[in-house]
């Protein structure tokens, strides 16, 4: 018996880690970085704020970072849209920071420019008449300016894109 291995139980500092995330979108008017009051009262924004408050108060949770990712719809000059997305990320961060005053959390704002990937996803999921043609244009051209021009040439469809798809891409994603 003397040669038998044995185990000693000792205290440890193991803490179970779980990652939880919440999301919300703040939408903007075309060419504007101004956060409208009605956007901050939307249910998804209120739920996001409640999520942050609840998790920041929990003893078993270490709060991460609240990211404000600014995007622009892919209509208009690319340089303008890059600056606009940066302004949107900053205004979205400022707005959510004001609503979450007193909560110890880090913030990070980043600009992502024109959201062609989001555009592709929304078009693919839509019931727009010429969606296959639009998706083909996206795969044929790498240039943002060329993509935009070719899609605008589909004038009947472009009006539908302006009302159904593009407004969803003008956002700060939290």
Indicate where each model-derived feature is located:
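Cysteine-centered nucleophilic/redox motifs
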Residues: 68, 83-100, 174
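Active-site neighborhood of thiol-dependent amide/isopeptide-bond enzymes
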Residues: 74-84, 90, 105-108, 112-116
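Periplasmic OmpA/Pal-like peptidoglycan-binding modules at the C-termini of bacterial envelope proteins
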Residues: 18, 23-30, 61-63, 102-174
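A short linear-motif detector with a strong N-terminal bias
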Residues: 3-8, 44-49, 87-91, 150-155
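General N-terminal targeting signals
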Residues: 41-45, 83-85, 101, 124-126
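Periplasmic peptidoglycan-binding/anchoring modules of Gram-negative envelope and division proteins
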Residues: 7-10, 28, 33-69, 73-74, ...
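Extracytoplasmic/periplasmic, Sec-exported soluble proteins
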Residues: 16-20, 36-40, 58-60, 76, ...
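Short beta-strand elements
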Residues: 1-22
């Amino acid at each position: 018996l003397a040669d038998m291995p044995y185990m000693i139980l000792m205290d440890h500092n193991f803490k179970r880690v779980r990652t939880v995330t919440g999301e919300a979108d703040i939408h903007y008017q075309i060419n504007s970085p101004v956060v409208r009051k009605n956007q901050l009262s939307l249910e998804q924004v209120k739920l996001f704020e409640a999520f942050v408050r609840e998790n920041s108060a929990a003893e078993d949770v270490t709060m991460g970072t609240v990211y404000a990712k600014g995007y622009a719809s892919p209509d208009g000059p690319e340089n303008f849209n890059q600056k606009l997305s940066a302004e949107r990320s900053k205004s979205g961060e400022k707005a959510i920071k004001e609503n979450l005053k007193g909560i110890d959390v880090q913030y990070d704002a980043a600009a992502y420019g024109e959201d062609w990937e989001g555009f592709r996803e929304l078009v693919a999921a839509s019931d727009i008449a010429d969606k296959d043609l639009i998706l083909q244009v996206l795969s044929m051209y790498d240039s943002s300016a060329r993509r935009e021009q070719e899609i605008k040439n589909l004038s009947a469809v472009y009006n539908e894109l302006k009302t159904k798809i593009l407004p969803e891409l003008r956002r700060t994603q939290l």
